[in-house]
């Protein structure tokens, strides 16, 4: 389940999947099946990503930050258990970052770059991009990362005090812009 709705929707979603013990019938690859779901385990998005990081398994608290298109969803795990009361959603997704980058490039250079071009630069893939535009993209991405880290801290999750796992498409794009030099305890992307 999405981080911010995990605590609120967990029981309803479990009930939906269990279907009051009723049999569920379906066809798969031409074969008929009838099953009864007896047990359901639910976890927040990104939970498996934390558990696969052996360096984090003994950490008492870990921040999970899922950077999506429109929002950044946050949750803290305490002793590997999701703490639903710490869920937050920040309206700082990658679309806002890319819009700001595009606006700065238009103002400074009069160029109209696509989101795909900007994403390519953020990943370190683009080769045929105006060098001044590349510098603006890098500078704006750094500014976005600092704004994001500040917002995470303001929401009560201090990235300087506990490790943070960054997930989602936005995390992949910003991988080159986040490091321990940003004051992070231990970033995992």
Residue ranges and their predicted role:
Residues 104-108:
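Conserved AAA+ ATPase "sensor/coupling" helix adjacent to the nucleotide-binding pocket
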Residues 109-113:
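Short, basic interhelical loop/turn and adjoining N-cap
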Residues 65-69:
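Active-site-proximal alpha-helical scaffolds that flank and shape metal-associated catalytic sites
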Residues 72-76:
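Short beta-strand scaffold segments in enzyme catalytic cores
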Residues 1-62, 81-96, 116-189:
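Nucleotide/phosphate-binding catalytic cleft detector across ATP-hydrolyzing
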């Amino acid at each position: 389940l999405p981080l911010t709705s995990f605590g609120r929707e967990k029981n309803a979603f479990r009930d939906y999947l269990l279907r009051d013990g009723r049999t569920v019938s379906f066809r798969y690859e031409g074969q008929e099946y009838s099953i009864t779901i007896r047990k359901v385990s639910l976890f927040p998005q990104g939970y498996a990503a934390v558990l696969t990081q052996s360096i984090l398994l003994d950490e008492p608290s870990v921040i999970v930050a899922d950077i999506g298109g429109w929002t950044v969803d946050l949750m803290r795990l305490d002793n590997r258990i999701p703490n639903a009361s710490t869920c937050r959603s920040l309206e700082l997704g990658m679309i806002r970052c890319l819009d700001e980058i595009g606006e700065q490039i238009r103002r400074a250079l009069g160029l109209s770059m696509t989101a795909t071009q900007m994403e390519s630069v953020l990943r370190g893939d683009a080769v045929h991009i105006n060098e001044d535009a590349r510098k603006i993209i890098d500078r704006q991405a750094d500014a976005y990362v600092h704004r994001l880290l500040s917002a995470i801290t303001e929401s009560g999750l201090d990235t300087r005090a506990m490790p943070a796992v960054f997930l989602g498409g936005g995390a992949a794009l910003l991988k080159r812009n986040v490091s321990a030099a940003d004051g992070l305890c231990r970033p995992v992307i």
